[in-house]
């Protein structure tokens, strides 16, 4: 275990691996083909075995474990992290059934014999694991690797069942003190899933940043969660949210016109319209919808270097290139002053474009110049004023108003801003007075998130209309927590050939159909696996290899015996004859022994007891979704605590009556 803590001065190991010697692998390529293993097998279990050959073997016993040292950077200062792989047998699990599988949507999967945990500990979880003593790290006991997977707060923690289904449990980036960014950790996880040939991966998306839930922020901006960049899509929702509800909620929020939103917010909040105008002016493309706004802000935030600045147009001296404009700068500035004075005279009310134009024509006779200025002036800062322009959603006409923002601006010479716009807004030259930082963009993004997306919590008070609709849709988006990614490989043989030629061997895709006696002899068929046999193997040899593979993977098939081929192809006795027939996949018929059937039956009886629990919540949920529930003490129906008014930070009441039972109780007035 001395290799757990390594100094930065260790030399990189030679290409050839010596027995018992630790190796260093590049984080950036770890998991790709040949880095370190050629994971070119057709099954998850075989590729995993190849990968573990390159790991440093840490312990055996009940839970085997391996470690890999991954290099984050070599210069200027070498930086490493440790990746542990811990094998958890079914005997070490608290529950036979996997709750993660149930919540993400594949709870009917057969029970696997093993889980393989992939863990990159954080500094805190590593310290807890190694038990800091006297200023130095003590070597952990071999059996204590079970504690590693139980700790919370790892940089990365995901696990695979032995059939290739898996779950991502934890991912923490730089914000939590890690040396890795969230993107680096996620790239590594996705490479591992791809290289090992995982089947499906599920996750419970609780990712957040600066107080914002990323599945809502990225959902509105990009139409998918943060994990969508790696191919994760809706798996299942909580509180009765279905895929249709989720997609409808996303669509409704993303397509909200900013002009409509601005119109509603004008009378409620001064800051929001000003900020909207600020980012309209920063963008080279018009921001039409709420999706455009958040997408632009995310893009802008990613472009700005840390502690660096970008010019804000609020106090910019903007000019029009005289070669592209037929009016002089002097005439344009005069027209702007006239428009500003016209808006001042109506005491900052909203008036139509035509009214502004008519008032300005008393001083400016050139209607072409007025049209040009009005077109370019909308949502621009002029001196101490913000000229707001919005489409009236009722009258369907453009309206203008003036906002005094002198108290919001930093001290400056407050020069009159003229227009630089060939058609709408072109290149800008800054006087350097007002700068926008990466942190300011994040702060403004949180402001929009809080005051627009999350207003159902009453940030702006009890208001109705469009903001309430946005709040309800945002709640539905947040209640969609479980996302999945399905990895498609050649082993999914619904439309592919039976075998793959491997020289003297054949890779055969097959599965075993067996009767579950507890469920009225229901036929259960696990996903196909690739078994490798010689080209001239007999059917009995195929049966034997299939038994070995499926016994190793599934707890319910630990003593399965294959008896025949489904379909009754009795005349076929050799595998090469079967290959010549061009079958699409081999389905074998098997039986499970009596003792195993008793254990399986007991397991299913426990499942049935859980299924007998009546769940009838007002949100529409009819089964457990991982959220907290409470049971009525009279009708014994379970409901979400949130749906019955119990706040998240409140304890579940010891005695609880649902609304229906509470209304039907007869007052016992004769009791003292």
UniProtKB/Swiss-Prot annotation:
Disruption-associated phenotype: No production of viable pollen. Degeneration of pollen occurs soon after microspore release from the tetrads, at which time the tapetum also appears abnormally vacuolated. Abnormal presence of ultrastructural features of apoptosis (PCD) in microspores, but lack of normal PCD in tapetum. Disturbed inflorescence branching and floral development. Impaired cell wall modifications after primexine formation within the callose wall, accompanied by reduced internal intine wall.
Function: Transcriptional activator required for anther and post-meiotic pollen development and maturation. Seems to regulate inflorescence branching and floral development. May control tapetal development by directly regulating tapetal programmed cell death (PCD) and breakdown. Implicated in pollen cytosolic components and wall development (e.g. exine and intine formation).
Protein name: PHD finger protein MALE STERILITY 1
Record carries keyword Flavoprotein: no
Example of a GO biological process term: cellular response to brassinosteroid stimulus
Transcription as UniProt keyword: yes
Compartmental location: Nucleus
InterPro entries found in the cross-reference section: Zinc_finger_PHD-type_CS, Znf_FYVE_PHD, Znf_PHD, Znf_PHD-finger, Znf_RING/FYVE/PHD
Tissue specificity statement from the Swiss-Prot or TrEMBL entry: In closed flower buds, especially in anthers.
Molecular function as annotated in GO: zinc ion binding
Entry keywords, A to Z: Activator, Metal-binding, Nucleus, Transcription, Transcription regulation, Zinc, Zinc-finger
An annotated GO cellular component: nucleus
Residue ranges covered by zinc fingers (PHD-type): 614-664
Induction details: Self down-regulation. Regulated by SDG2 via chromatin methylation. Seems inducible by brassinosteroids via BES1.
Protein's organism: Arabidopsis thaliana (Mouse-ear cress)
SUPFAM superfamilies the UniProt entry points to: FYVE/PHD zinc finger
Stored CDD domains: PHD_MMD1_like
Alphabetical list of SMART domains matching this protein: PHD (SM00249)
């Amino acid at each position: 275990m001395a290799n757990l803590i390594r100094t930065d001065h260790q030399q990189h190991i030679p290409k050839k691996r010596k027995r018992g010697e630790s190796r260093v692998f590049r984080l950036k390529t770890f998991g790709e083909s040949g880095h370190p293993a050629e994971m070119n097998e057709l099954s998850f279990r075989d590729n995993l075995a190849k990968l573990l050959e390159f790991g440093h073997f840490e312990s055996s016993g009940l839970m085997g474990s391996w470690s890999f040292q991954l290099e984050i950077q070599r210069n200027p200062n070498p930086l490493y992290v440790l990746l542990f792989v811990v094998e958890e047998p079914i005997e070490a699990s608290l529950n036979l059934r996997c709750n993660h599988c149930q919540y993400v949507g594949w709870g009917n999967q057969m029970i696997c014999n093993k889980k393989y945990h992939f863990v990159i500990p954080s500094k805190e979880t590593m310290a807890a694991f190694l038990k800091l003593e006297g200023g130095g790290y003590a070597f952990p006991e071999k059996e204590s690797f079970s504690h590693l997977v139980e700790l919370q707060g790892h940089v990365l923690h995901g696990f695979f069942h032995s059939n290739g289904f898996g779950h991502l449990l934890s991912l923490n980036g730089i914000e939590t003190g890690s040396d890795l960014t969230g993107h680096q950790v996620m790239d590594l996880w996705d490479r591992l899933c791809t290289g090992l040939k995982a089947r499906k991966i599920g996750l419970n998306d609780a990712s957040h940043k600066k107080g914002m839930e990323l599945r809502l922020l990225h959902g509105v901006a990009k139409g998918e969660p943060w994990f969508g960049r790696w191919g994760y899509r809706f798996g299942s929702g909580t509180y009765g949210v279905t895929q249709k509800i989720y997609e409808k909620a996303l669509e409704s929020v993303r397509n909200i016109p900013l002009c409509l939103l601005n119109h509603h917010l004008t009378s409620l909040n001064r800051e929001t319209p000003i900020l909207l105008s600020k980012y309209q002016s920063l963008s080279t493309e018009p921001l039409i919808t709420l999706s455009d706004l958040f997408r632009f802000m995310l893009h802008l935030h990613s472009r700005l270097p840390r502690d660096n600045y970008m010019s804000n147009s609020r106090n910019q001296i903007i000019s029009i290139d005289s070669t592209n404009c037929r009016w002089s700068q002097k005439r344009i500035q005069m027209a702007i002053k006239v428009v500003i004075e016209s808006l001042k005279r109506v005491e900052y009310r909203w008036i139509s474009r035509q009214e502004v134009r008519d008032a300005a024509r008393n001083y400016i006779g050139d209607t072409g110049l007025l049209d040009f200025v009005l077109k370019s002036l909308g949502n621009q800062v002029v001196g101490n004023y913000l000229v707001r322009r919005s489409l009236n959603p009722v009258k369907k006409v453009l309206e203008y108003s003036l906002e005094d923002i002198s108290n919001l601006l930093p001290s400056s010479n407050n020069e009159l801003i003229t227009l630089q716009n060939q058609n709408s807004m072109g290149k800008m030259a800054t006087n350097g007075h007002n700068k926008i930082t990466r942190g300011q963009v994040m702060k403004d993004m949180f402001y929009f998130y809080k005051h627009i997306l999350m207003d159902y919590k009453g940030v702006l008070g009890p208001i109705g209309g469009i903001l309430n609709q946005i709040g309800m849709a945002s709640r539905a988006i947040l209640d969609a927590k479980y996302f999945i990614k399905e990895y498609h490989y050649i082993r999914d043989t619904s439309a592919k050939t039976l075998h793959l030629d491997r020289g003297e061997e054949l890779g055969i895709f097959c599965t075993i159909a067996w009767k579950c006696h507890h469920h009225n002899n229901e036929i259960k068929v696990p996903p196909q696996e690739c078994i490798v046999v010689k080209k001239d193997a007999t059917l009995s040899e195929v049966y034997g290899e299939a038994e070995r593979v499926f016994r190793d993977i599934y707890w319910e098939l630990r003593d399965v015996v294959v008896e025949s081929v489904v379909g009754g192809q009795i005349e076929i006795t050799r595998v090469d004859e079967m290959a010549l027939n061009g079958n699409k996949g081999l389905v074998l018929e098997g039986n499970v022994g009596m003792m195993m059937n008793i254990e399986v039956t007991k397991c299913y009886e426990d499942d049935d007891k859980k299924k007998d629990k009546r769940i009838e919540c007002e949100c529409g949920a009819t089964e457990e979704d991982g959220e907290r529930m409470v049971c009525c003490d009279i009708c014994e129906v379970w409901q979400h605590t949130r749906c019955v008014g119990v706040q998240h930070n409140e304890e579940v009441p010891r005695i609880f009556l649902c609304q229906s039972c509470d209304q039907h109780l007869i007052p016992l007035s004769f009791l003292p």
